[in-house]
Amino acid sequence: MSEGSGDQSQQRPWASPRQQPIKGIVQPRVLPPFGKPTRHTNKLDYIMTTVLKEAGKHKHVWPFQKPVDAVALCIPLYHERVARPMDLKTIENRLKSTYYTCAQECIDDIETVFQNCYTFNGKEDDVTIMAQNVHEVIKKSLEQAPREEHDMDVYWGKNKKKPAKSDGGSKSSSSKKNDARGPSEAPSEAGSEVSSVTTASAAAPTVSESASVAAKPERKVAGKKTGKRKAESEDDEKPEPLRAKREVAVVKKEVHQPLLPSMKPCLKLLNDFSTKKYQEFAWPFNEPVDAEQLGLHDYHKIIKEPMDLKSMKAKMESGAYKEPSDFEHDVRLMLRNCFLYNPVGDPVHSFGLRFQEVFDRRWAELGDSSSRASSVAPQSAPIAPTPKVAKSSAPKEPKESRKEHKKETTFEASGAKSEDLMQINNALSMIREREEKLKAELAAAQAIKDKLTSVKNRREDNPNEPFPEKLINETRALCTTQVGQNASSSSASSAALRNGRSKKAASARLYGYEFDSDDEDNKMALTYEEKRNLSNLINNLPNNQLNTIISIIQRRERSALMQQQLDDSEVELDFESLGDMCLREMGAFIKTIPTLNGNGDDEKPKTSSNPTSSGATGSKGSSSLESKNGKKKKNFNMSESSDDETSNSRKRRKRESSESQSSSSSDDDSDDEDRPSIPRKSGQPPSTSREWNQSSAPPPRMGGMGGQPPMSRVPASSSTSVSAIGKNNAAASSNSYQAPKPAPVPAPTSSRPPAAPRPPSKPKKTGGASILDTLLPDTFGASPPQFFQSQPTTSATIRSPTESQPGNGEDEQTRIQRMRMEAKRARQKEDEGSVSLSNQMEMMAAFEFDNTY
């Protein structure tokens, strides 16, 4: 580029110097500098009138019509790599100001435009391809340029067509003046005029002059008559072309007459997409797709019904669109064709997305514009007929004015109803889209029905055929999706007219549970512990119950689950993204599920050996304490782990170590085996090493209020159930810590027999658990909260949550609110005098390390 620019500067001494960009734009000079020779030739005129105009009609010419804005396009290195920026608009302005001396200078500037594009952009860039297309058009036009170049007068600007107009005007004015002055002037003047005319045409004798002078008065009258006749004939001939023009204008009005007032906003929207404002992304849709020119041989095989903006405009002008929904259908069809043929990531696909975004926004604004137009139209309606009636003098004219008045009133009435028509058309389009979706769903259901029928027939013949679990899951997913859509659509449509409780309750009853979305309790936000317990319960659900959970999420939160996630084998749910109503409904569904069996996941109630920790006694004691004091101390267990395997292995090692010790301390050791060590309130570890005999085990993981929750929960064993609470508030479990002092443990009367083998199932606390154990199960090792799990029974029947109402006469909502407040107060009071969990864990680990090494 540097050598080429040096050669050009040597050959063209008047070339414009390199300029610095101003706000990212370099505008080359347009006016010729002082002393530069300029001229206008026939070849330059051909470039200005033909070449540049044909290039300006190309759809890819828009990036080259103005100087490059490096700031707006975020290309700061453009002016460093491009020495002489140039554009087609600058070339056109130079031609108009006679900047060039020959056509070759103009052609060099045109070549500079495209060479700059090829230099800065890559070979496969979209702008490079567009530049090649425009360059080919200009080359073809230059092939037809005149070969010989000669000078030519400038015929534009201030001197545009002045000489031709002045000559013709003087001649016509002089002839008219002569015609007008001829009959009114004196005979001598007329004679001189006639003689001058005759001498100009041919030589005449002097006798003819006298004869002409003698006959002048008659010629005056004749001249007057002929002049009048000529004037009348001219007046008669002049209105004829005007009438013809008026007739043509009327024909054009008749062409646009079928355009309804409701279609005027659509026409305006269509014209807006043809402007430069939207051509950045709308240019691929301006004209029909030329598959042969673009090399798209499979386009018409994939796209059965092509559509473009030009075809839509032709249909709009011909009155083919009767409703705005027809216009919207064609726009949607054009965009569907774009998305169907062009894959994701293609530039045309991205242009289609931008076009769709702008169209949706503008289409939503059409209702407001039509309402404003309808509000303005009735104001001007009564004013129009008054001047027509005043001007009417003949009896025929009032009829015409009445007809026009009727037409205006009909158009105004239709304009006033345009908003209603727009809403009706939108509703019709929604119904049509719904019909298409239902047809697709019906086809899918029919296919699944055929498969199920064939499987049923085969199983009747061969009972040993494997069960089609995948087909059953597809059927459930299809049915639950349809139920969710129907429920959401029906509730949305009837929300303004009637209560939607029956619709949602009906959808919930299909799965055997009751859920009232209008209840205030179901709208309350879930706490962190409630979400964690719900997550654990969902993880333990069988596969056949997970489909109902997915259907609830689809019905409540459509954006939470995508079809892509449903196709995968595993679906991850983020509870933070789900709504409170969705989580409450999932909790209501889980409450109706009977007790799970097998794999150690079931949680069955087990009574304690201690009679004071029975369900009735515990419930009475806790209720009496709640009624007297109104608050309860928090039971905090330091030795309870959140891992089942860690807890079982630690207890097994404790039993083995206790059995290996002396018989003199066997009683105490056996008592300590089943009762984990009790840490002190200050957070210090126990004083004896026997309480931490399981030093080889890893430190227990605590499920605390300030840290992350454990992944699983270990319920308390039957021997560590909560005992009854006395008057001094000293009731405590054998493995838990209570303030202000622990409950006394009765001394054993005899040596304890060896511990019996424990069942593999995880034990569970009875109904006598404390309030904190009920509300915060994972923190203190209790069972799940009662509002997420019904009382387990041996039967597998599905029960409604109304069956487990408290029998003490207290409202369920009041009880839950009271329990929450008590738990909050107890947690605040305990946190004030306790050490953080992290410090406790560090001290426990240090103590175990010292005892071990």
From Swiss-Prot:
The keyword rRNA-binding does not apply. Residues 516-601 form the NET domain. It is found in: Nucleus; Chromosome. Changing residue 113 to I: In os118; 50 percent of animals lack phasmid socket cell and have an ectopic distal tip cell. Its main location: nucleus. Keywords: Bromodomain, Chromosome, Coiled coil, Isopeptide bond, Nucleus, Repeat, Transcription, Transcription regulation, Ubl conjugation. Expressed in T-cells, Q-cells, V5-cells and their descendants such as somatic gonad and syncytium. Interacts with acetylated histone H4. Interacts (via BROMO domain 2) with smo-1 and ubc-9. Belongs to the BET family. Required for the establishment and maintenance of stable cell fate in several lineages including V5.pa, T, Z1/Z4 and QR lineages probably by repressing the expression of cell fate determinants. Required to maintain non-distal tip cell (DTC) fate of somatic gonadal cells through the htz-1-mediated repression of transcription factor ceh-22. Regulates the subnuclear localization of histone variant htz-1 in somatic gonadal cells. Plays a role in the attenuation of the let-60/ras pathway, probably by preventing expression of activators of the pathway. Involved in adult locomotion. This is Bromodomain-containing protein bet-1. It comes from Caenorhabditis elegans.
